[in-house]
Structures are given as C-alpha cells and as structure tokens.
C-alpha cells in the first residue's frame, strides 16, 4: 500500500510517500480501504514538524479519513460498508488516513450517514465536524439567530469557513474575521454578511463595547481576548483552535460583569452519541453548494507542500486528499 510516512532524523520530521506492507498496520478490529482523507491544521503541524503533534515515529499522519471496510471483526461493521473516522488520536499516536489502508478500533468509526459519500464526508472532515460542535455549543448556551451577530475568527480556514456556511444556513447573521483580503468574496459566498480584518483584533481593553451575541474562535491569543471583551451580556464563545497562539491575555471582567460563557470545544474525544448527532446535523444543515465551492483536491505526494501552505496561511477552505 502507498502511504505518506513521517520519519524523524536529527530532530527533523521527514515526509515521503512509501510503499508499505499491510502487515505493518497497527492493531485494530476494522481494516479500511481509504478513498479520501484531508489536510487539517493539525495534520499540517504534524507533517511539517512545526508542532509537537507526533511523539512516536514512524507515523502515518491524517486525523480523518473515509472509505470502505475491507475486513471487520467488529459486528457493527461489515466488509464493503462505507465508514468515516475523525479524531481519537488517529494520525497522532495511531497510524492515520494518509495511506491506502488504515486499521483502527471499531469504536472510533462512524457508519457513513445517509446523504453523504466518502468525498463529501472529507470535505466536511474534522474541520467541519468541529465547526458543527461549535454551533451546537452556541445553541446549547441559548444563542439564537434573533439575538444578534455571531463573529467567526480565522474564517477562511477549514473550521471557520464551514462555521460561516452552517450559521448562515441556520439563519444567523455572520461576521467573518480574516487576515487575507483575497478571501473576502469566498467568505461572502458562504454567507458572511460582512468581513473584518484580523488586525482590528490585535489589542483590547478588559471590556469593550458590546457587539456579539455569540462567537466561534479558531485563533486564540489576542484575538480571543478581544472577542471576549466585546461579547454581549450573556453571550457565548465556542473556542476550538490556537492558530494565533495558545495564550489568552484576558481578564475576569467579561465573565463576572457580563455573564459571558467561554465554552471549549474538542472534537478528538467527542463521545459516540454526540458524534453521531453532529454528523446527522451536518447532513441536514450544510447547503449543497458548500460541497462545490469549499474544496481543493490533491494527491498523497502533494500533501507535504500543501501542509507548508496551510501553516503559512495560504490556503482557503478545505484540502482533500484523493488516496485511492
């Protein structure tokens, strides 16, 4: 089988497409013929070695994939069944989806929801799944379309762009924050009512004028601090990323004076029931147009170059990897 293999040499991560024997696949009760995978920000950190994502080498990256079960010892899945996977540490500490085959635990798989195929599932991928969990977090906090504008930071990335499309479809007024002017038309086509430059979020006071009913933040650091300072009374921020850094230079003021909620969103260890619910929502809530405008297709061998481009903020929307 062909696979993108990460190896470490003199402290550097080296990525190359290699032919591997299937016997080298890790333990698991379902072996999957992978048709599609994708490149997420975390994959880019792993492939470039820019983030301490991978501790054990050699490793096949790819934190999500979709394909067909080849063999299964799990009664919930049968040979020939379409399945998808996101999270569970796959592509980080268990060989992942950037290979023609993957072997995983049945507990980690989701049967392909009706209305999706492998390609569409990976246009959504970890990024879209995370975006849906963020939207559900805002709903759980009682944020409704009539409450006011929702701001999405890092809006041109995979999570942000899907969040814009979902929120727009659900009737919310969406304001997108992006550091790149070249993405503005794209974000408007997804449903953003207006777009703000990221440098407007560089500095903040402990409290600012109330602007946002809700927020989805993929950036962290000063951007998240500014968003918190601008939240309406009783508003909620769903935070799921650290593209701008992992620190948070904020104060307790938004929380104790404006009743603001900061809700963390993790997609890796999401329990199976919530996971299935999110995928059903994605099938129902993503407009059909999303699948045509939001994805670029690449091959396994192109993944390292595209990983660099993702780190350098040069890619908009989703990057699909055609594996088989």
Where are the model-predicted features located?
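Glycine-rich beta-strand-centered segment in the early N-terminal region that forms part
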Residues: 23-38, 50-90
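Residue-level marker of beta-strand positions
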Residues: 81-82, 101, 149, 169, ...
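NAD(P)H dinucleotide-binding glycine-rich loop of Rossmann-like/cofactor-binding domains
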Residues: 86-151
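Short, glycine/polar-rich helix-capping loops at beta-to-alpha or helix-loop-helix junctions
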Residues: 98, 179-186, 246-252
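Glycine-rich NAD(P) Rossmann-fold beta1-alpha1 loop
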Residues: 128-129, 154-161, 220
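Adenosine-nucleotide cofactor-binding segment
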Residues: 168-223, 280
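Glycine-rich phosphate-binding loop and adjacent beta-alpha segment
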Residues: 222-289, 323-324
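C-terminal hydrophobic helical "lid"/dimerization subdomain
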Residues: 273-324
């Amino acid at each position: 089988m062909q696979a993108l293999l990460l190896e470490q040499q003199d402290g550097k991560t080296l990525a190359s497409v290699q032919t591997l024997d299937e016997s080298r696949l890790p333990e698991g009760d379902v072996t999957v013929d992978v048709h599609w995978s994708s490149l997420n920000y975390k994959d880019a950190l792993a492939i470039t070695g820019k983030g301490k994502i991978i501790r054990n080498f050699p490793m096949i990256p790819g934190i999500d994939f979709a394909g067909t079960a080849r063999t299964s010892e799990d009664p919930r899945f049968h040979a020939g069944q379409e399945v998808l996977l996101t999270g569970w540490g796959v592509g980080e500490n268990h060989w992942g989806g950037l290979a023609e085959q993957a072997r995983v635990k049945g507990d980690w798989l989701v049967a392909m929801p009706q209305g999706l195929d492998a390609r569409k599932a990976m246009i959504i991928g970890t990024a879209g799944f995370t975006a849906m969990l963020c939207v559900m977090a805002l709903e759980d906090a009682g944020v409704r379309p009539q409450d006011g504008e929702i701001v999405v930071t890092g809006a041109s990335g995979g999570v942000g762009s899907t969040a814009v499309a979902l929120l727009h479809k659900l009737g919310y007024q969406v304001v997108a924050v992006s550091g790149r002017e070249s993405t503005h038309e794209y974000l408007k086509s997804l449903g953003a009512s207006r777009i703000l430059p990221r440098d407007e979020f560089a500095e903040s006071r402990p409290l600012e004028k109330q602007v946002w009913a809700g927020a989805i933040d993929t950036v962290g650091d000063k951007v998240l601090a500014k968003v918190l300072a601008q939240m309406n009374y009783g508003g909620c921020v769903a935070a799921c990323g650290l593209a701008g850094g992992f620190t948070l230079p904020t104060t307790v003021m938004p929380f104790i004076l404006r009743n603001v909620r900061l809700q963390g969103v993790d997609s890796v260890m999401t329990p199976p029931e919530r996971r299935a619910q999110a995928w059903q929502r994605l099938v129902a809530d993503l407009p059909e147009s999303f699948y045509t405008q939001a994805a670029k297709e690449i091959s396994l061998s192109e993944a390292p170059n595209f990983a660099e481009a993702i780190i350098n903020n040069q890619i908009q929307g989703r990057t699909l990897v055609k594996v088989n």
